[in-house]
Amino acid sequence: MNKIYNSVRVSVPNWIDDDAFNDLLALLIDYKDCVQQIAFFSSDFHPPLPLRTAKTHFSILRDRIERAKEAGFSCGINVLSTIGHHPERMDEALSGPWRHMTNIDGEACEASFCPGDEAYQEEYVAPLYRMCCEAKPDFIWIDDDIRYGHIPIGNGCFCDGCIARFNKENHRHFSREALKTALEASENTQLRKTWLRHQSRKIADLLRVIRRTVNACDDGITLGLMTGERYFEGYDFPLWADALSDGGRYEILWRPGGGAYTDQPFLSQIEKAGQIGRQCAGLPENVTVVQSEIENFPYRLLQKSPRSTALEALLYVSAGCTGAAFNILPSAPYIENLDVMRGHFTAVRNVFPFEKLLSDLAGRTPTAGVYDGWHPHAQAAVSGSFLHDWGGSFAEHWNAVYTLGLPESFDFHTAAAYLLTGTAPRAYTEEELLKLLSAGVYMDAGALQTLNEMGYAELTGFSVGERFREDHLEVYTDHPLNRGFAGRARHCPQVFVKGESAALLPTDGAEPLSYLTDFHGKIAAGCAIGLYQNKLGGKICVSSHYAAADMGDPFKAAQMKRLFRLLSDDRLPFLPESCVRLRSFARQTPRGNAVILFNPNLDCLNDVAVLYAGNRSEIDYIGEDCNRQRLSAAGTDGKMTRFLLPPLPPFSMALLLPKEIA
């Protein structure tokens, strides 16, 4: 297969009618320079289609696919519903004797079916994909209904068959009620992990059925899977990729997704970049085509501007994708014609040379920098409801840290330093925790308390003392990390924004970096953030006062940047020296780190000083226009070299390359 960067996903109203399809093809032919692939949706509503309806759709799609291929596109089908999403137009939807997706209370979703129901797999899924193959697609995408969170029941599947299988495989005798009680008990982390593995295996079994079915028809058809952050599903992407690729024998596609349907505010796109980065990091290396989902649901023209739609593609390639899948087209009946989308596709064309540069350079290389603390078993570690809380909250807790410009890493084994919050440590194995505690870790009081309760107090250096509800000032101590602002203070107004605030109790050898006082100077806590080096050589920093919030003042920003240089043993690939709001991603290419910058401000960033890893005389700066500038060093700082960046316009991106890559 020639390298595919971008695809367009096409809804049924835009292909089922001859005139609508002709308009679609005319539009996309004009943008073949930036879109190489077309994926036709199998359905325009979210429960599974009856097989008779699917047969009609696929017979029409055979003609559409043939014509699109003749026009030079790679072309295939996006099966919207394999097990189903949620109730919609149920009079047209599939019905049958199979097990429905069911929550822990026994409530069923009539529009979705249990992925572990073998009768459903053989009597519906296999025939559906055989019909799909008859349309002669280059590829078949399996949509993101392959999950366990379905409207209106929430997380599944706890049907009688699933509980019986879990009991049999794990030598248990749970009733539904007893299983609910056991899973909701936060101390039952191992049971939760066992359930998550059970969840992942059911999905893998379904994917194997699809693989076998397609192979029996035409093993030249490439299969792809769309995902989101799949915490309640067990997040076992290596297992799913193995099932879909038949043990790595076949090339497969992947499409990480997750919300961000509007650009107001654009923060949701930045958060989605993190979600996508975590999904990419969980994929095996043999998955080489990874297209981000870019979705403007419900596909209103004003849902997202052309610029923000195109910018998403750049962000997600920076985080780990190799291209993008644009699901942005309004449906034919609701607009005069598709020409209204030319502005969006022109914006995609404008950034495509830079997108291609990033994709070709970074590919599937890992991210370098500060690890955000995500774990595939994060759902097992939630402190509240296992059935209703979301394991992704641990990673998204740290957005304020990354706004300082620290490069965000999603790869546990290649990170330079680590973040931990709350009960997240429960997700990790002992081996993983010892790796963390032997490296450099920044954590909050919740993570400290969790680690101490798990038996790691000897390695953390602190314990949690009195907790505070009233406002305090955090005063910086006379420590090298506070050079230039010792004695100054940070005020986090707890009366407005309730946050974590507590006293830290240091052990021998721990160094306070700040302490808390009232507004009259009386000390309330002798340590609020502290540093400790344990017997494994690990550098442990604990913050008990707004550890992941209110970092926008120059003193806290400077302290945090110096701190992570220390925690990482000066292995960070990049760091802004100026006090600016900036997002960065660093990709570990075979020839060195490539650093990708994003300006999330409404203002141009001017005269920004940055530190780049290594002692070097120059680096290359490449803007979105792909013009290359050679930057000369403006000094050194330890193991890093200082450079002054050219102006970086609002909501734009740039690439920094050392000369060994350039």
Where is each model-derived feature located?
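N-terminal structural segment of carbohydrate-active enzymes
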Residues: 1-40, 73
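Aromatic-lined carbohydrate-recognition surfaces of secreted/lumenal glycan-active proteins
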Residues: 2-16, 74-84, 141-145, 192-237, ...
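The substrate-binding groove and active-site-proximal loops of carbohydrate-active enzymes
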Residues: 6-18, 43-58, 106-125, 187-205, ...
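Short, acidic/polar
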Residues: 14-31, 119-131, 237-244, 305-316
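Hydrophobic targeting/anchoring helices
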Residues: 31, 36, 41-42, 88, ...
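Glycine-rich, aromatic-flanked loop segments that form ligand/cofactor-binding clefts
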Residues: 36-39, 60-107, 139-147, 220-224
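Active-site-adjacent "subsite" loops/lids of carbohydrate-active enzymes
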Residues: 74-135, 152, 170-198, 208
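A conserved amphipathic helix/loop scaffold
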Residues: 393, 408, 412-413, 419-661
